C-alpha cells in the first residue's frame, strides 16, 4: 500500500484525509504566533507557500479555504510565548489540533520535528508542495497579519502594519528609538 511519502509523484496527489499544519509569526519580535490546521473538502487551485503569495492573493485564498475546509486556527500571545517558550506553545498547539480533529489520524506538519507528539508526520517545506499544508500556511499567515494590522492602531510608532512584527531593520530601529511595548516578546533578542 502506498503512503503519502512513497514517491515524489504522490506529493502533488490530493489526499482528502490529510490535515496540514503550519504556523506564522514563530520568529516575530512581537504579537502572537498563529498555528493553523486544515483538512480540505476538495482540491483547490492556487495554493502554495503563503510567503510566495501577495497579501491580496492570500486574502482571496483565505476566504476560499475557510469555505471549503474543516480548519482550526490557534493564537499564542507574546505573554504565553515568554512564559512557556516557543517549543511548549508549539507542542500545546499540536495537541489541541489532534484533539480538535479527534477522529482523524493523518497529520502533516511543516518542519523537521513533531516535538514528540505522536501521530504527526513532518516534512520540510511541505507548505510548498502539499495543498493542505499550503492552506494551513495561508490561514496562519493571514490571521497573523490581520492581528498585527489591528494592533498597529494602538501602537502606531512600531509600524506593525508594515513589518508584521518581524525583525526587520526598520522595526529594530523603532525599538531602539521608542523602547519595547507590551506586545514585544521579552524572551527574544530584540536588538
Curated annotation (Swiss-Prot):
Q: Which reaction does it catalyse?
A: Endonucleolytic cleavage to 5'-phosphomonoester
* Tagged with keyword Cytoplasm: yes
The biological process GO terms on file are: DNA replication, removal of RNA primer; mismatch repair
One GO term describing the cellular component: cytoplasm
Q: Which residues bind a divalent metal cation?
A: 22-23, 110
Which UniProt keywords are present, listed alphabetically?
Answer: Cytoplasm, Endonuclease, Hydrolase, Manganese, Metal-binding, Nuclease
Chief localisation class: cytoplasm
Q: How is the cofactor bound?
A: Manganese or magnesium. Binds 1 divalent metal ion per monomer in the absence of substrate. May bind a second metal ion after substrate binding.
EC number annotated for this UniProt entry: 3.1.26.4
Q: Name one GO molecular function term.
A: RNA binding
Q: Where in the cell is it found?
A: Cytoplasm
RNase H type-2 domain sequence ranges: 16-191
SUPFAM superfamilies found in the cross-reference section: Ribonuclease H-like
Q: Name the chain's protein.
A: Ribonuclease HII
Q: What species is this protein from?
A: Campylobacter jejuni subsp. jejuni serotype O:6 (strain 81116 / NCTC 11828)
Amino acid at each position: 500500500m502506498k503512503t503519502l511519502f512513497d514517491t515524489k509523484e504522490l506529493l502533488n496527489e490530493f489526499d482528502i484525509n490529510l490535515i496540514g499544519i503550519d504556523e506564522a509569526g514563530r520568529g516575530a519580535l512581537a504579537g502572537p504566533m498563529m498555528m493553523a490546521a486544515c483538512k480540505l473538502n476538495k482540491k483547490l487551485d492556487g495554493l502554495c507557500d503563503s510567503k510566495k503569495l501577495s497579501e491580496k492573493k492570500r486574502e482571496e485564498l483565505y476566504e476560499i479555504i475557510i469555505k471549503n475546509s474543516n480548519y482550526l486556527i490557534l493564537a499564542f500571545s507574546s505573554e504565553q510565548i515568554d512564559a512557556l517558550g516557543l517549543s511548549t506553545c508549539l507542542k500545546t498547539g499540536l495537541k489541541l489540533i489532534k484533539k480538535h480533529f479527534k477522529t482523524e489520524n493523518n497529520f502533516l506538519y511543516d518542519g523537521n520535528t513533531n516535538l514528540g507528539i505522536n501521530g504527526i508526520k513532518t516534512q520540510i517545506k511541505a507548505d510548498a508542495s502539499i495543498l493542505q499544508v499550503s492552506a494551513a500556511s495561508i490561514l496562519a499567515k493571514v490571521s497573523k497579519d490581520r492581528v498585527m494590522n489591528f494592533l498597529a492602531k494602538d501602537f502606531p510608532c512600531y509600524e506593525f502594519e508594515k513589518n508584521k512584527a518581524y525583525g526587520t531593520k526598520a522595526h529594530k530601529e523603532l525599538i531602539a528609538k521608542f523602547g519595547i511595548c507590551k506586545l514585544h516578546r521579552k524572551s527574544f533578542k530584540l536588538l
